Amino acid sequence: MAEDKSKRDSIEMSMKGCQTNNGFVHNEDILEQTPDPGSSTDNLKHSTRGILGSQEPDFKGVQPYAGMPKEVLFQFSGQARYRIPREILFWLTVASVLVLIAATIAIIALSPKCLDWWQEGPMYQIYPRSFKDSNKDGNGDLKGIQDKLDYITALNIKTVWITSFYKSSLKDFRYGVEDFREVDPIFGTMEDFENLVAAIHDKGLKLIIDFIPNHTSDKHIWFQLSRTRTGKYTDYYIWHDCTHENGKTIPPNNWLSVYGNSSWHFDEVRNQCYFHQFMKEQPDLNFRNPDVQEEIKEILRFWLTKGVDGFSLDAVKFLLEAKHLRDEIQVNKTQIPDTVTQYSELYHDFTTTQVGMHDIVRSFRQTMDQYSTEPGRYRFMGTEAYAESIDRTVMYYGLPFIQEADFPFNNYLSMLDTVSGNSVYEVITSWMENMPEGKWPNWMIGGPDSSRLTSRLGNQYVNVMNMLLFTLPGTPITYYGEEIGMGNIVAANLNESYDINTLRSKSPMQWDNSSNAGFSEASNTWLPTNSDYHTVNVDVQKTQPRSALKLYQDLSLLHANELLLNRGWFCHLRNDSHYVVYTRELDGIDRIFIVVLNFGESTLLNLHNMISGLPAKMRIRLSTNSADKGSKVDTSGIFLDKGEGLIFEHNTKNLLHRQTAFRDRCFVSNRACYSSVLNILYTSC
């Protein structure tokens, strides 16, 4: 009976097209039963005969494997040997994801803000008329700058800063702007500017440009409309009635121009006097007029749309004047008022840094913020307020919750006419002590409005000043030519007659020893080149291992690669009339840099007595004398030549900023600690 039943089942399955589930198992225990050896062969034959039904198999009706039924799948998956590993893997995955999320949140919360592009490396300031002439007309231009971008990148520069190139009159070195939206033909075309922006960005660099909001040229269309009282332009400038006595114009008050004499000039067209803080060809805009403020913001938007990465706002302390017309107070009160003609003879309490001026500057910052939303496209804003006291200058950083300038340009080192360890220390500490907490410092040793370093202090101080520049905390800023030690030009007959002192610092860049120092192929250049260009030029110094250019490149590279320099603490050790000594250090890095700079005559320094735990000998990481690089010197008797600088590297865990004795002598902008295990910075030190 059993055999007949088996046959019937097999026949039925064949008739159904062999839709069998060969993976089906009634009971797991059946698989573990040992078959009867005696019946194995018979059962196999019977089964084969029952299923196939003939000698030759017929697969025509066979369908694909249908899979395990749901009920069976649940039965298997519910068994302990499958369920437990599955649950373990699931909860391990959940735990891993939660750990990763928590770690990510912790890293973000504890990590300091990454340095922005304007903090990461040096800025290079270019006076475009003197950098490189591309069209043989004797004037530097925008194409010339583009041609020299490879040189700039070789210096490890991160930001190119170009001074005024707007369409302007020749007065005051192109700072009397006729059209803020046009490139002066001397420098090229708007297409040249756009190509320059693209080339700078292709090199991974950023571009900031000068912008002078305080005044325009008297040839500007706004002024022409204002002097004829045309519509809204009537009050775009500062106009007041003047009186006339014996054919002489009597101004409204005793306010003086920066260049001397009255800051009021009578205009015959309007029959009134207009106010000018600078030259009479540069009338001051009326920033108490909201339309003027909006016009300036529109100009900022125009250049931001062109792709510039930021602005240097010049002469911002002059934006507002007092509403009243009271006389400013004389420095020498016994001086006869009619003889007061020089700017330095008055206290300028009514014509500079007026209430509301910082609000205007903040509004410029807000305009730039509208273009700073894309990652990596933050728009920088710096301010120039020349000859301000440090406590007033740092006010341009803004308030804790109201941002203003990213930093006001710090030109106080470039104002030193004599140098010593004491004077350098005073400039450094004055800035760091007055700078608001959490703000970023910057340093300049030269600029277009000051005498060049070599001529001001002496050629022997070029290298040590550049070493100072790159080892101080913050952004180093270099005026073109300072990297090779260019000096002022000495010429009896200059092409243009303005302030001779500042004109001499704008001489053509010295590229090589060919005609015109490689600056131009023209027969005449707008200013003569310095007579020392045969020996002081880029090509010569490229091949000299001990040149100023080679040291500059080494310093720039060290600054870029060392967290101690670009993120670390600055701790002052000692200074006197000769030298200044300080350290750069960072929590988590068990070594420090000890910087020793001599600004006086030759001297002997005992460094071992300044810092406890110093070894008898210490290795020089970098020196103004390249022959000393890598050597070890006796720390108890370090001989320093005039203008010599040394950077020592010392392995220690005893950092100075943690010590009570140095607590008031250490500064840091944004506190950070380094984890060598994770290779990250964090703030919870």
UniProtKB/Swiss-Prot annotation:
CDD domains: AmyAc_SLC3A1 (cd11359). The chain crosses the membrane at residues 88-108. Glycans are attached at residues 214, 261, 332, 495, 513, 575. GO terms for molecular function: amino acid transmembrane transporter activity; basic amino acid transmembrane transporter activity; L-cystine transmembrane transporter activity; protein heterodimerization activity; protein-containing complex binding. Disulfide-linked heterodimer composed of the catalytic light subunit SLC7A9 and the heavy subunit SLC3A1. The heterodimer is the minimal functional unit. Assembles in non-covalently linked heterotetramers (dimers of heterodimers) and higher order oligomers; the oligomerization is mediated by SLC3A1 likely to prevent degradation in the endoplasmic reticulum and facilitate heteromer trafficking to the plasma membrane. Disulfide-linked heterodimer composed of the catalytic light subunit SLC7A13 and the heavy subunit SLC3A1. It is linked to Cystinuria: An autosomal disorder characterized by impaired epithelial cell transport of cystine and dibasic amino acids (lysine, ornithine, and arginine) in the proximal renal tubule and gastrointestinal tract. The impaired renal reabsorption of cystine and its low solubility causes the formation of calculi in the urinary tract, resulting in obstructive uropathy, pyelonephritis, and, rarely, renal failure. Hypotonia-cystinuria syndrome: Characterized generalized hypotonia at birth, nephrolithiasis, growth hormone deficiency, minor facial dysmorphism, failure to thrive, followed by hyperphagia and rapid weight gain in late childhood. This is Amino acid transporter heavy chain SLC3A1. The lineage of its organism: Eukaryota, Metazoa, Chordata, Craniata, Vertebrata. The gene is SLC3A1.
